[in-house]
């Protein structure tokens, strides 16, 4: 147990996040989010196969959800801080994902072309709008190259989707769980400006339950959600002063 500046005891075993619990443990929620992002209409959650990696050393805490559906390998992350290195993180993550898939097939050295699922990397962002004011932004790995490799020679992207209030309304309308999650996080961020973090989280949870926002989820996992938020938001506060 670690004592923070706000005199909050943070349990460091909680490296999972609310985003991952919502979308990484419920195929129905993940499918709804996929449909909203891709303008599809899949109805059977069993069409979706989770591929989320565990214990990824370059990820500080688990805000990632990966799954396979319709020959597309999706990686979704939530970020409340702007990070220009997301394309590199996604590149490394996908290397591990494809390594697992190729090991399963054991055809890497075949004379025939080995077909792989199409990658689709999305970062859901609800941090400061000073860093991302537009609804979407595509981050490119080539921006990190120390020398110019030539247009189109190699590229890897991360698509940032802004889920702050008033942004990407069509996605929010199509995936109500994402909308409710964004409301919940926004409440915590707003309340922590005027009270201690633990009080802000408790108030946000109570209000969301009263307003029927993630009610069943919060009632069922209230203690765990509070612990995850304490860890995530406390680490976010520390990162902001670095």
Segments predicted by a language model, with ranges:
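Elongated, amphipathic alpha-helical interaction scaffolds
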Residues: 1-242
């Amino acid at each position: 147990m670690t004592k923070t500046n706000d005199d909050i005891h943070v349990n460091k075993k909680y490296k999972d996040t609310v985003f991952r619990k919502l979308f990484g443990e419920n195929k129905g929620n993940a499918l709804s989010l996929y449909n909203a992002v891709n303008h599809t209409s899949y109805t059977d959650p069993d069409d979706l196969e989770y591929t989320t990696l565990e214990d990824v050393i370059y990820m500080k805490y688990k805000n990632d959800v990966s799954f396979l559906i319709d020959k597309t390998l999706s990686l979704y992350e939530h970020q409340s801080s702007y990070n220009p290195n997301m394309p590199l993180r996604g590149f490394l993550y996908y290397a591990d994902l494809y390594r697992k898939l190729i090991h399963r097939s054991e055809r890497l050295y075949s004379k025939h072309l080995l077909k792989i699922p199409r990658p689709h990397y999305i970062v859901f962002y609800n941090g400061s709008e000073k860093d991302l004011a537009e609804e979407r932004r595509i981050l490119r790995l080539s921006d990190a190259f120390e020398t110019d490799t030539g247009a189109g020679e190699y590229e890897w992207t991360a698509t940032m989707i802004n889920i702050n209030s008033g942004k990407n309304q069509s996605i929010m309308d199509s995936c109500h769980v994402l909308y409710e999650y964004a409301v919940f996080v926004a409440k915590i961020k707003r309340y922590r400006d005027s009270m201690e973090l633990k009080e802000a989280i408790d108030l946000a949870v109570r209000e969301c339950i009263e307003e029927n926002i993630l009610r069943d989820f919060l009632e069922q996992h209230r203690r765990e959600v509070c612990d995850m938020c304490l860890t995530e938001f406390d680490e976010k506060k520390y990162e902001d002063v670095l």
